[in-house]
Amino acid sequence: MQQSVRKLFGTDGVRGRANFEPMTVETTVLLGKAVARVLREGRSGKHRVVVGKDTRLSGYMFENALIAGLNSMGIETLVLGPIPTPGVAFITRAYRADAGIMISASHNPYRDNGIKIFSLEGFKISDVLEQRIETMVSEADFGPLPEDHAVGKNKRVIDAMGRYVEFVKATFPKGRTLKGLKIVLDCAHGASYKVAPSVFEELDAEVICYGCEPTGININEHCGALFPQVIQKAVIEHQAHLGIALDGDGDRIIMVDEKGHIVDGDMILSICAGDLKKRSALPHNRVVATIMTNFGVLKYLEGLGLQVFTSPVGDRHVLHAMLEHEVTLGGEQSGHMIFLDYNTTGDGIVSALQVLRIMIESESMLSDLTAPIVKSPQTLINVAVREKIPLETIPLIERTLRDVQDALGPSGRILLRYSGTENICRVMVEGHKKHQVDCLAKALADVIDAELGTGSRE
C-alpha cells in the first residue's frame, strides 16, 4: 500500500509541525524503516544507529516511533536522550555507528519538530541519499522484515552527555582555563541546557545561566540565538565579560561583547579566520562564507589575504563548499560555524571556546577583536508568508525589487529568499547609508507582506 506524504526533506532534513505531515508518528516509523533498509543494502551484518533529540515535548513520541521503525528492520539503536546536534555527530563517530539521527527542529518553535540524519562519518547525508529514503517512504517498500531474534533492540547510552562534554573541552588548549571570566549563557531551553553550563563551569568560568530550564514547550521561546536581546541586557546587568546564546539544538551561536554589542556569525568567522591565519593553521588560507555574509566582512577577510568561497545559505551548503575546496573553517551570519579540525557539523559550544581561546591568548576583550571589522549597513527582515509562491511571478514584487536596486545603485545589493524550514521570506538589503537601507528594506518587505504575508514579521 502506498503512503501518501508530501515532500519529506527540506534544506535541513525533515521538518514540520508535530502531528502534521510530514512530522507524524506514522511517517516517522516509515522513515526509520527506510533508513534501516538503506543501511542493510550497504553491508551485511548487524547495524547500529545513534538517536538523539532536543527538549521538545513531541520528541518523546518521535523518538519512540523512529526507534520502532529501526528495530523492526533489525537495527540496534543507541539512545542518547537530550543532546546537541553536534553531540549526535560526535557520538556516531565515537561509537563507530552506521548512522546518527537527531530529532529536532533547531531554532523553530516547540510545536515543530524535525529529523536530521548523519552518515557514519558524522556528516549530514547527501541529497541523493535523502531522495532514495524519501522514495522508499512514499512507496512503503522496505523488503523482507527480519524474524524472531533478528529484530533490533535499543540501548540507552548513559554517559553520552559526559563523553560529549569531554570531547568539547578537548578542543580548548590543555593547561588553560576560563578562570576570571564571567559568562552569560543562554541555552534556549534546548538541547544544550546541561552540556553547555558543564563545559564552561568545568573550565572554571563563572556562568550565569538563562534558558536552562526546559519544560518541553519553551524551547526557543523569546530566548537563545534568535533572541540575543536577552544576553545583551544580562551582560550589562551582570557586568559580564561576554554573552553566549545557542539555539535549540546547539549547532549555532550568537555572542555579545562586554558592551552589549551583538557579535554574529560573520564576526566570529572573521575573528577565528584571522587567528588561524596568524598561526599558520588555515590550510591554503581559505574560508567559506555565504551569500548573506556582510560585504564589509568579505572585504575584511580578503584584506587578511584570505581566499573566500561563498555558498548558498545553510550549514549543509557551507560544509559542501568546505569539502569541495579543502577548507577547514566556514560559517554563516546566523551563527552556524564549522571547524572541521574538531567536528563535522556546526557546533555552538566548540565555536565559543575558539573565540574564548583567542581572547585569553591575545589578552583582549571581545570588543577589541571585533573593532577592526567594519560592517556595511545591512538590514534583514523576515516576513511570514501564507505560501511560497515564486517571487519572480508576482509583478508588483518584481517592480519594487527593480526600484529598490536602482535606488541603492551598483554598490548595493538585495537578497530575497524563502526559508528552507519555515514559511518565511527573508528580505536582505545592503548598501552604504543605514537610513536608506532600512527604508528600502521596509518598503520591499511591505510589498511582500501585502502580496503574500500573514501580517507577521521580525
Swiss-Prot record:
Its cofactor is Mg(2+). The modification Phosphoserine is found at S106. Its EC number is 5.4.2.10. GO terms for cellular component: cytosol. It is an enzyme of class 5 (isomerase). Activated by phosphorylation. It comes from the Bacteria. Catalyzes the conversion of glucosamine-6-phosphate to glucosamine-1-phosphate. Belongs to the phosphohexose mutase family. HAMAP family: GlmM_B. This is Phosphoglucosamine mutase.
